[in-house]
């Protein structure tokens, strides 16, 4: 059976929790106050249109999407801490790792820095998945 987007999101969030990286996590839809100092994470699952695996209405659809984890820090400490934390997140989602059922990490995770805001430095980790 093809996992639902909710099942995939649950598995991704569980895997991030199980990695026990030591950073506070702002889960989607929950109240969260970012720390005054130090790194924190903000995960978001973005399902994409599935790949139809045939022409019949009963054929399966292959799920795909991206899991992004925003890695944030307060300015003043430089970019090394936030990039180290991004590397920790990437190391927790290796290429071909099982997410749930047949859903796997599709490619090596990658990250990029976003223009800093007045109150935060940002690195976004992208983890593509397909199943």
Regions found by a protein language model. Give the residues of each.
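Small/polar-rich, solvent-exposed N-terminal microdomains that initiate assembly or binding
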Residues: 1-59, 77-80, 84-91, 96-100
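Oligomerization/assembly interface segments of phage tail-like spikes and tubes
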Residues: 59-76, 121-131
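A generic structural signal for ordered secondary structure
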Residues: 13, 38, 65-67, 118-120
